[in-house]
Amino acid sequence: MPPAEGLRGRGLSVVYVTSVAFTRRGKQLSEKVRRAWNDMSSARREIIVWKDAEKLTEPLFRTSDVLLFFCASGIAVRLAAPFLRDKTADPAVLVIGEDGKFVVSLISGHLGGANRYAHFIAEMLDAQPVITTATDGRKMAALDIWSKKYGLVIDDMKLAKR
């Protein structure tokens, strides 16, 4: 498992991480990640959801920097969809299957850091990170990451994509 300073060493900082699990196996995996992650974030909470998941998702989107869903991707997509704003505002959303084999960067791969968190968590679990952004697949620098690194702001993300 990565050392505690591994998160900061990768340029990742976390203000608030939330884990959401729907099953006992999901909760166990969430606990494993929590123990490995330990003191790497200033705040962390875990939520076990049996019902009313839709009601909980909206406040989680507003208050979390990183959301870890321990469930099927389809569940996470359906829960997140109504609250998605844009890539500059959404939290990093990752999906970890109950079996712990894959860590999927689902939302905010670049600016939210989900791609880097996926690699980091995958190391913890000896899992496969799943990254689908084109720049990462091509091993290219992403303009939004480059801008963030140098303290620059992109005024119009639509123009930046051209």
Language-model segments: what does each one mean?
Residues 5-6:
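Glycine-biased, low-complexity coil/linker segments
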Residues 12-40:
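N-terminal basic/disordered segments at the start of proteins
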Residues 40-59:
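A short, well-structured beta->alpha microelement
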Residues 57-76:
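Short, structured active-site "lid" loops
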Residues 111-162:
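Internal alpha/beta core interface subdomains
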